[in-house]
Amino acid sequence: MEVAARSAATQAPASSLTIRRVGVFLGAEVSGVDLSKPLDRETVDALSNAHAQHGVLVFPNQAISSEDLKRFGRYFGELSVHPFSTSSADSAELIVYDNKEGNPPAATDVWHTDETFREAPPMGTILCSKIVPEVGGNTAFASMTAVYEGLSDRWQRFLSGLEAVHDFKPFRSLFPTDRAGIEKMRKFEDKYPAVTHPVVTVHPVTGRKVLFVNPQFTLYIKGMAEDESRMILEMLYRKTLIHEYQYRHRWDANTVVFWDNRNVQHAALHDYYPQRRLMERVTVAGTRPIAAEPPADAKDLRRYLMPPLSEFRNRGTAQKRQLDL
């Protein structure tokens, strides 16, 4: 895989801003900026470009308020409200994660891209650590551009033009099973119906291709039998687990992490109970994912599933492809 050559540290246009890579495929640490204060346009533009190039930006030593966090998020777009997560009583845009009073956290995250059950998933997510456990509680990130580029040419061609259906399936367990709960869930289904996204998207800033399926919200690939779709998705999900494609962040208090939801997946490790972990989050609204290629038709699917006829001839057999297209 070709890796773009970048210097270990680059000076952004704002003279005091330094961006230092911390991972091969994603991740950079940003210094020389104080998020408790308003930022000028030059700094915002530099951070926006770094966000697209590195996928995950880490801002250490940022003792900021909730209002500071929201202001920082608004530099990059409108803040969205998560329909299922627990928001602050003071602001619907602010999500608070806190296992105070010894309450165990939920089970460890499934790898995912945030809120792909929306027609327009968020462009980015910003998380600020307030209280962190002494041990555990890391967050893992994976570059879905690196995952795509690591696939063989044949797999890349096959996936091109495919579409997958996404749904808010993990949140269905939040609804009670009584009549009132079922009615409430149906209202959410009307508001957030299953949506279709390209399996391979194009990042709107870098122009690089991205594998855009995830085990938390993706249901199936359109135009395939259930077992075929499941087999392909499970193979693609395993690619996310390749360590070289990942950046694993160990949290310190007062750290802000801003990741690109358009080409990065993440999973939080909930291995810190009974220690406390208090985090605040804002989410920056995005636009519909851009397809790398027009939707594929059935003939395209069959063509790439079968090996070329020359492979059979080279084996000295008259065997013919099942589908001669």
Regions found by a protein language model. Give the residues of each.
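Non-heme Fe(II) oxygenase catalytic core, chiefly the N-lobe of the double-stranded beta-helix
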Residues: 2-253, 261-325
